[in-house]
Amino acid sequence: MAEISKENEDNFIFKMKVLYNQMIHIPSMFSTLKTEFPLFFETDTTNIIHLPMTLQSKIIQKPTRGYCSKFIKMLTQTLERLDKEVNESILEKFLEIISPITPHQNDDGGDNNQSEDKTEYCWKSYYIQNKWITLKNENAYNLVGMTTWGAAYQLSDFILSNQNLFINKNILELGSGTGLVGIILDFIKPLKKVILTDYSPKVLKNLKFNMELNNLEIQDFINDDDDDNNNNVNKENDDKINQVRVLDWEIEDLNILNNYSGLNDSNIILGADIVYEPSLCKYLVSILYFLLERNENSVAYISSTIRNQSTFSIFQKELNLKNLTVIDITKQFEQSSPTSPFIYDRSQIVLYKIYLEKK
């Protein structure tokens, strides 16, 4: 009869937790686990009998009711195939999950009496440098900035494997979305300033929520008028490293950016999955040029998933029109990067280093 060590069991649980919290396709999850931990799926082992209680306490939580339901279905089917009894607590959890959701409760388990928010959310978590981080995402893909996209994972991988590039730098992120990149930057010490920006009020609210969910202190500029100098001066005296603020790309007079305190000091400009709308490419590149021109030796790192080649070609054309130097560092980065804490499809994602040549 196969014996499984405590260490092996812990590794199995940890791997399952990583896959589960990133919402990996359930059959793919079990296939991966079976390949890496075959002893847990052999009919002659007794070790899987006591796993349900461990799974109940360590695994079966969010990210969503639907995903949890599919997970428990697959788990019970696997146990039944192995002719093992399904733990009663697992079945109780399953019945709880599939029961009708109350009118005042959304997918995050919260009470909606006050907010009346009927949006369904999912919660994805990642284990990075001995620490779990969690992001609240929208379940439906209705608003770009409410989802954590693959390019954000690539850019986060780049940051984690090139931390020396970011130490003691002022960093600006365009289109910060759910805030993954901002949270990853918190792993780097020291930093001077991190400015996270987006445009949609809903996205900014969620961005702020995710930062605070992961215990990051922020300066909140979301509801400030940019010409309110007294208010901004007071906030600039705040010693918090992270700022969250509104930034609309569609501005004709870029000099208005001078009113955004700290933007012109950016040494590094970051962006992930921000090349998706053809009409915005001109404005995005104009902002990149404006900021790169004002700070000598500044550089931008833009990670993009190429879903539509024509849209990406417009972006490339606008970069050429501004005489910006563009280097595709995707392969160079992939060859040197360590194992990623994220599970995602890299096949259509590119990473550009963009800067302005000195005259």
UniProtKB/Swiss-Prot annotation:
It comes from the Eukaryota. InterPro entries: Methyltransf_16, SAM-dependent_MTases_sf. GO terms for molecular function: protein methyltransferase activity. It holds the Pfam family Methyltransf_16. Disulfide bonds: none annotated. PANTHER family: HEPATOCELLULAR CARCINOMA-ASSOCIATED ANTIGEN (PTHR14614), PROTEIN-LYSINE N-METHYLTRANSFERASE EEF2KMT (PTHR14614:SF130). This is Putative uncharacterized protein DDB_G0277003. The lineage of its organism: Eukaryota, Amoebozoa, Evosea, Eumycetozoa, Dictyostelia.
